[in-house]
Amino acid sequence: MANLYSIRKIVKVPSSLIITKPKKAKGQPKWQLNITLDELKQKNQLVGLASSYVIRSLDDIVGTGYSEERVRELKQEIGMITGSNYSKKNQQKLMGLQKELFDLLYFPYITSIHVDKAKHYDRLLEGFTINVFDNDTGELISSTNYKYFLSTSASIKKWEIFFVDERYVDELQRRVDNGRDMSKQFVPAKLAAYRALTMSSSNPVSNTSRVLVVNDLEVSFKTEVLELDGSKQEEPIMRHVKDYDMGLNCTDGFGFISREFAEVWAEDLHLDYTPAGFITRNAFCKGVLVPFDYKAYADEVGIYYIEDIWGNVNDIREIDIVLTTSMLKLANSYTSYAQYFENCEKNKYTFSVTKYTPKVIDVERTTNYQFIQSLELSDEDLYQFIKPTLDEIKNVKGMDYRHTLAYLRGVSLTEDTNVVRNDFSTALMINGDLVYDGGIRSQINSMIKKRISDAKKGTIKVRGNYQTVNIDPIMLCQHMFGQPIKGLLKENEIFNRFWVDKGAKEVVALRAPMVSYNNVKIVNVVTNDEIEKWYGHLNGLVIINGCDTLCARLSGMDMDGDSTFTTDDPYMLKGYRRSSLPVICLQNSVPKVVCSMEHFQNSDRQMINSKVENVGVITNRATSIECVKAKFPVGSKEWLELDYRVQACIMKSQDSIDAAKGIDIPFGFPKSWINYRECKINDNDSVEEKERKEFYGKIVADKKPLFMTEVYPTLKKERDALRKKENMRCLTRYGRTLDEVLENPLTDEERETVKFYHIFNPVDESPCVMNKIYRMVEEEFKNFKVENIKKEHYAELLKTDKGYPKRLLKELDELYSDYVYMNDMLRYKQNILKESSSERTTAQDNIIYDLQQKAYRIHNNKEELCNAIVDYVYLNPKKSKNFLWCICGEQLILNLLSKHDFKVSYPILVKDDEPCEFEYKGLRFKMYTKIVEGVEDYETIG
């Protein structure tokens, strides 16, 4: 989602930087960090934080005078100066504007601290100071004493805590509580999570008091399940229950927005369409609002007056939004919606949108290894499953720039798509000959190598996509109006506009984190006149039924913004067409209390000190167990035990989630499943215990699968070193390669070599699905070489005729060194903190922005600067061409467009009865050409 507010800059540092400083004098904060702005930038410790209720409230409390309009004006003025001639006057003016822009965006009133060690947490609660200085002048930019504010559900899992300026933290905490009844009892971790909703990135939209709050619709039905109980012993007890009473909250996290008011929100968000769902926030309010014509339903049933949860009667014709109690988390802390709304106005809450369903739905997406590791396919079928991905890589290797564009931008582009980006894919749209350029070709080659590596670890392209989930909305209407609950969808049925239009009859539904084949379900895609009448406009939602186990199968999916991956890939349908049952985990509860700040901090401590592994560790262990399972015949004692262990990982994964909610987890992951030492037989063991340990010793999953060498570089190095050493030994002793010996050992000595190779091998090379895919991709590309074409004269296409001062070529050395250092620091930080893809993207954007600011301080004219950097990287072959695109991407595209009449050409799909210009992956395309307007404006591309 595009943010309508600019990203603010906050300090984010590890706790060790703060607490290792000497203690200060009495009366001052105990811990203090003195650091320069340049240090923060170079170490990626000045990070972006998107607009949220907290940011907007602090602006108001502090009185910062922040103005988004002024930010836009400054960016435009900077754009004008970077487009004007170089002069000292312009240079000084540019630096002044950059400083004003930085001062507006810099936000020292909140900071994020990564707790390096558990013992640091309590020290940080005592308070600390961060002083930020100007590197050149030594001037103090900010000096802030911080106190504890909160942690979010996502941040605490990474041991990250937010602290706020001590002068404003109490008022901010008061506003966050929004006048709630403080005597109400809650589970501390849950209330902490509800309060943390104020940190969600969001765009405010039109507010309304015309809101109806209704109770959730909960149904139950009998079904067959596998029940796991982890409360009594380390290894969860599994029970087959044939008539399990399955409960389902059909409105868990979703409500309605009138179609008229949805159009107002679409306009607020500057959209040219009305989304099928808005993921919203308000005070203690979270979930998806679906544009649904509940007023037309009222006309059909002839009922217009509905009682809300407080007993107040509302005319549905006067209602803009319908909330459910699962959305308004603290509904019982208010006496009416009017009281809630009054507090929201007092504390400046309003409805805001964090995300919305897209206008164009992806035609293709890639799988991950969790989605495909449990496939039951023959080797031939498995190869056919990955073949389109292999062929795609080979096509991109060629010199047809059209194939490259289809790969880079996907197959979902339309005539209306805004295709202009500041990267080489847009350059190819403007001039296809640039596919021969050495700099661009090197980026394509790097992309191909990465794509091969990704394919080895299960990133396989299929027809399918992620879409937001919703349960049969008519059921909520029937519930609200007191009608019989029937819904429009039956068991195993879904409605989805995308799949209906594609003619799909059935799809596979999956959702991460996925552990076992029990987490998959094949569902039927249906429609009829009644479904089209009520749901036909909801493009971007997967509407599921309210009478089966799909939510339970897909890792406890709910309706507050969760999405599911669906695909009609024939091999995934075939590979998952098997008999399986949903796995249900028995869960403990936590007593409710009247919560204080101490309770929230105790929840933090519980997470930081928790011995329960995170979900990622658990799912990786399940993958390792799945790999070991491949060694044994299906149905054997070993296979059945390992199959149980994979299913038990669903319980262990749930334990990790429950730990974050403050639930006490009595047992950790069974060590005997992953450690041979736990299976060591002792002399005093009973006969039964010796037999158990002997059996367990045969099926220990203590290694990562072979394909994980593409995920963990150090693992790959270890394996490569072992293979190199053993290959030399085999050639010397046996006159055969290591692979030849492994495949067919001829002597006892060779068999011993095979045995010890597998013992010392850091990875498990069992023939599991993912290892097979790894080997297939490796075999396919073992002699594969990327094109290495260098035609330096293509650099002239990227430049204009404008000259530049030759001093720039020398002055760029320092900027290039900063580029290398900052990217090295980014990679190091990512390896340590295991940041998400969105966090990595944000960090990379920060680097680009900071480097651009430094570049303009060297020379204010961006056209001349661009020409200089083109020469700098092309005259020095060892310099990264990515440096050029980071600094000058916008100007490069502008240069190319101005030379080609501002035209771009890109591939779009054609219908069966239309002529096509080329085929790619079995799909038919034509090149569509259009004129791009307004790109000379700084804001358009930037």
Give residue ranges: language-model regions.
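Active/binding-pocket-proximal capping segment
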Residues: 582-586
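Short hydrophobic-aromatic micro-motifs
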Residues: 508-510, 564-567
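Short active-site loop/helix that positions an aromatic residue
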Residues: 553, 566-581
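Conserved small-residue
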Residues: 1-555, 572-574, 588-942
